């Protein structure tokens, strides 16, 4: 599923699909993030709200890096603190609605933490992207506003490999080694 993020966990050093309350759980959506459950990974039932409409997990926020859209990225991960969902956020091009610290129209990566017992309940959401277009190859090509569009996440040999599209022109990988301290990105004011 291009815009779907099924919940996984780490088991014996590998990322595997896991169930939440006896069902597989998937976050999905290309403007806002919704959710669905399945017994068999083939047939999915969207989660609806009290009005019988799609229940929203997150949606775009004015004046934030994800002001134009929020779209699911790689598989979500069940941790001891909750479910971590990485997502793609697009900044508005309209100056009154966008986050002016980042390029208008840029795609950046955000993350939320949801309650593992209530996966629709957001416990935390980053107000700034954890990954944004900074390298020249992420800001040239077909999408010059800048794009890091995260799609794949692999846990391999105790490191995380995050595969992403760069300016809609190539694919790259960012590697995170939890054993090494790395300085954080200095977000502009």
How would you label these PLM feature ranges?
Residues 1-68, 77-143, 157-189:
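Beta-rich carbohydrate-recognition and catalytic domains
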Residues 138-140, 148-152:
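Short glycine-rich, acidic/polar surface loops and turns
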